[in-house]
Structure formats: C-alpha cells, structure tokens
C-alpha cells in the first residue's frame, strides 16, 4: 500500500481560529487555543443541530466545509482520541447517583455517533469509520484512508477532533488538551499538490500542543517532517 498522499481540501476550527488565513498565521507561531467558542453549524437543520454538542459541532462544521456541496459520496474516517467524553462523564455521574440513563444520550455518546449524525444530516449512504488510537489517532485515521484509496476510492474525507477532557480525568493527561477539529480531503499523490507520507521513525515527545493539533500545524506550516506519536512520522515531499 502506498503511504503517500495529497490533500486537495482542508478546514479547521478552534477557539479564536476559524478562517484559513488565521490558521496559516497560527501555524507560523502556534499557541494552545482556549475558550468556549462553538461553530454555528448553520448548514445543519435546527432540529438535528440541537442534539449536537460542542465537540460534535466542531467536527461536523469542518467536515461540511471540507467535503463541500458538490463533491458527492466519498468514504469518511472520523477520528478522536477521547470522543464525546463530556457527555459520557455526565452519564457516569448520573449512574453514580442511581439516576436512570437516557437511551438517546447513550446513543449519542458512542464513538461513531458524530459521524452518524453527519451522515444522516447530509443524506449520505457511503462507508464511514470511527477510530481512536490514543495519541496516534491522526496516524490511524490517515492509515485507514490510505487503505480506502488503495481499494479504489478517488478521495477520502478524514475528520480529526477532540476537546478538553473533564477535570476528573486530569490526572491521566499526557499532553495538552483543547477543543479543535480539522478535516482533510485525501487523494492519491497529485503533481499539482504537495505530497505527504507516513514513515517509520522515532516517536514524538510531548510538546505545547495536542499531537493531533500538531499534525495540522505541520501540514499548514510547510515543515519537512514531524515525528509521529507511535514511532512513525510525517514527511513532506519536495
């Protein structure tokens, strides 16, 4: 399987960062986004949007913008290290108080729920996956996308998203956390677009950003390499 690919469209969201120009400037001097900003997600019908919480809104907003209106069906890989942990944490607190759980809230807390809501809202019937691989979640997502390209898909939508975790879990943090979401439309290597690849290498050490956000910084900055979270790494081809 060829581990080289191009990105022909992208979108990203975080507090204080939404426009492409702002993201490119951020990539030159990155900082950890903080704040309670939430995208409008105006593309989604209000009755559907009301069920989507902050993390889901960020993920669906970048997916909608990246896929576009005229792209048609394509396989999708939704990837999040923690998923909608805030919703899960609230349900665990309800269980601890011996309160009944809402079946709707349980369904919306599953790891593929955000992808499912996107698929339903857009009337999509194609293949989608939901993956999680600790700090190596972006690498796992792109690896899945490369497999789909190898199977003949002309393009794959990759959506990576995470949020700050509830305070009760802070003792388990091994990297900074913040709300962020980004999407790439991945295509086979294209001569008119920069080519990226995954490769073997030394694992990344902790930095000032969540690893998944650092991958976006690498993509936007033009850097030649970025260590991966699992012993692999990212390479930009000249």
Q: What residue spans do the PLM features occupy?
A:
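Active-site-proximal alpha-helical scaffold in enzymes
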Residues: 60-63, 132-156
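Conserved "HGTGT" condensation-loop signature of ketosynthase/thiolase-family condensing enzymes
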Residues: 1-105, 109-130, 136, 160-238
């Amino acid at each position: 399987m060829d581990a080289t690919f191009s990105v022909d469209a992208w979108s990203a969201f975080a507090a204080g960062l939404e426009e492409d120009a702002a993201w490119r400037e951020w990539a030159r001097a990155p900082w950890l986004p903080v704040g309670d900003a939430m995208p409008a997600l105006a593309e989604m019908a209000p009755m559907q949007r009301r069920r989507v919480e902050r993390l889901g809104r960020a993920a669906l907003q970048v997916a909608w913008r990246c896929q576009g209106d005229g792209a048609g069906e394509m396989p999708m890989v939704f990837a999040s290290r923690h998923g909608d942990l805030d919703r899960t944490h609230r349900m665990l607190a309800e269980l601890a108080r011996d309160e009944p759980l809402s079946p709707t809230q349980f369904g919306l807390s599953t790891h593929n729920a955000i992808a499912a809501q996107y698929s339903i809202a857009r009337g999509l019937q194609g293949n989608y996956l939901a993956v999680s691989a600790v700090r190596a979640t972006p690498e796992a997502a792109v690896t899945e996308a490369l497999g789909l390209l190898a199977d003949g898909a002309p393009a794959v939508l990759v959506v990576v998203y995470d949020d700050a975790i509830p305070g009760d879990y802070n003792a388990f943090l091994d990297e900074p956390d913040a709300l962020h979401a980004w999407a790439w439309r991945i295509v086979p290597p294209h001569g008119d677009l920069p080519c990226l690849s995954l490769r073997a290498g030394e694992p990344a050490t902790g930095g000032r950003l969540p690893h998944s956000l650092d991958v976006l910084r690498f993509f936007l900055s033009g850097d030649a390499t970025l260590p991966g979270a699992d012993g692999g790494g990212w390479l930009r081809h000249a």
